[in-house]
Structure formats: C-alpha cells, structure tokens
Regions:
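Conserved catalytic alpha/beta core of Sir2/sirtuin-type deacylases, generalized to analogous enzyme cores
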Residues: 1-285
C-alpha cells in the first residue's frame, strides 16, 4: 500500500472545510497527537518540574516510560501514578484545540472514536453519547486480576494520595484494593487482555457501530487527528477501509506525519501540519 503526502496546507484546509460543510455525518478519530497539540506534556521541563524526585531516584526522563517502571512496592507505585493521574486527568483542562473542534462539529451529526484516556472530550463538553474511548480512562480503577467486570471512579482517592504522599510514598492505608477479592487495583487502561470493559464500554461500542453502519450509506467525512502508527488497527486502518468502501466518503488526516493510501488518494486530504493551527483556521472559516 503506497502512501501519499501533501505538504501544502492552505488548499487542503479549504478542502476539509468544504467536505465538513457538505457531510451528513462526521466521524472523528482522535489519537495522542490531539492532546499533545492542546498542550499536554509528558517529558522535558514539565516532567522535571513535577517528577524530579522520581527522576533523581530512578533516572526517569518522561512520564510514558516511567509508567512501565517496576516500582519496589505499592506505596511508591501509587505515589507516582496518583501524581500523574492528577495532573493529566484532573488538573489540566482541555484548551483551544478541543474547543475549536467542538465549534466545527457541534451542529453536525458527529461521533468520536478515540484511543486517548485523558477524558478531554467529555471535559470539553462533547456529547457523551457521541464518544467511544476504547482504551480506558485514567479516572477509573479496576481489579488488576480482574475478578469482575466493573470500574470505579478514582478522583477522591487520587486527590488524597497526592495530598498525603511523602518521599515518593503514600500511606499504606491509601493503596487501593479490589472491593470484591481484596487484591490489587490498577488503572483502567488497555495494556493487555485484562482491561475491564464494563457495561458503559459496551454501550458506547454499540452506539459507535450503529453510527458507522449509517455512515457507510451516507456522505461522510472521516476526520483523523493526531493518529500515528502505535495502534493503527483501532482508528487508521478502519478509517481507510470505510473510505475505500463508501464512494461518498472523504478521508482527512492531520498530523505532522500524516499519510493516506494510494487506493483512496482521490478522496483523501492529507495535512502535515500542527493540529492546533489547522483547527484554529477551520474554526475561523
């Protein structure tokens, strides 16, 4: 499959604006690049400012790789994770990127499929019934085994952990335990096949499939934002297939390394540019 690239920005943005206006349905695919464009940080000065103690102790350089670190005990692990969750799930508010995107689609029949777990779409006031976040949510905990298929809001516990941690440890009594089996809890993230899919997950999946079925018979804009090749089977490849099989579909992708396959190149718009700038231009069109 040969990929096509488009380095010019102005005309592709006009094309996306026209396709958006003409579309009966808009399917948004959002990856990590969208939140990065909105100012969410994971390394550099931000990491040093907020995790200097962990960086000094273990040589950590960024939040992503630090999340895989085998901490020696639960009290230290949850000191790190509570601080990280607090910053990226509760303290950092969605900014202009999400507001510009909502401005573009709030009067359209839209749906959002996202691999992001920062809850930004809901916090930016997108309609919850039009969201399917497939990979979990930093704001939810689950049994690590798991012994049952349920998730639990963690806001109050996370805030308590952050407030009471000292020397990279939380009090032992704050370590979360499964309310059923008493075992370890973990964040509801899709790292492997133990990720809990609760009734809310299945309800969202059903709404997404219903939207996709209707979109397959409609004039549809598939708008992909910040989606790389980390998990292409969730958003990118399905979007390519949907565009290929629906002659009334148009695929638009925006990221610094955006590409589209040759087979749908005549109905694709590729913008290799900063997502924030593109959405700002579109929202002001």
């Amino acid at each position: 499959m040969i990929a096509t690239r488009n380095s010019s920005t102005h005309k592709p943005i006009e094309t996306i604006a026209n396709e958006l206006e003409r579309a009966d349905k808009v399917l948004i695919g959002a990856g990590a690049g969208l939140s990065t464009a909105d100012g969410f940080e994971y390394s550099g000065a931000w990491f040093q400012e907020n995790f200097s103690d962990f960086a000094a102790a273990y040589g950590m350089t960024d939040a992503y790789t630090a999340g895989f670190y085998p901490f020696p005990d639960e009290t230290e692990k949850w000191a790190y994770w509570s601080r990280y969750i607090n910053h990226n799930r509760y303290l950092k508010e969605p900014g202009s990127v999400y507001q510009d995107l909502l401005t573009l689609v709030h009067n359209k029949d839209y749906f959002v499929l996202t691999t992001n777990v920062d809850h930004c779409f809901q916090r930016a006031h997108f309609d919850k019934q039009r969201l399917f976040y497939t990979q979990g949510d930093y704001g939810l905990w689950q049994c690590a085994t798991p012994c049952h298929q349920a998730t639990y809001d963690n806001h109050d516990q996370v805030v308590a952990m952050v407030a009471q941690q000292h020397d990279r440890h939380i009090p032992a009594e704050l370590v979360p335990r499964c309310p059923r089996c008493g075992g370890q809890m973990t964040t509801n993230l899709r790292a492997d096949d133990t990720c809990v899919q609760d009734p809310g997950w299945y309800a969202a999946a059903k709404r997404y499939q219903a939207f996709v079925s209707e979109a397959a018979q409609s004039r549809t804009l598939l708008l992909e934002l910040g989606v790389g090749m980390n998990t292409p089977a969730i958003i990118k490849y399905p979007f390519w297939r949907m565009t290929y099989h629906n002659p009334r579909a148009h695929y638009a992708t925006v990221s610094l390394d955006a590409v589209a396959p040759k087979q749908i190149s005549e109905r694709s718009t590729v913008v290799q540019a900063d997502i924030a700038s593109v959405l700002r231009l579109l929202a002001g069109a």
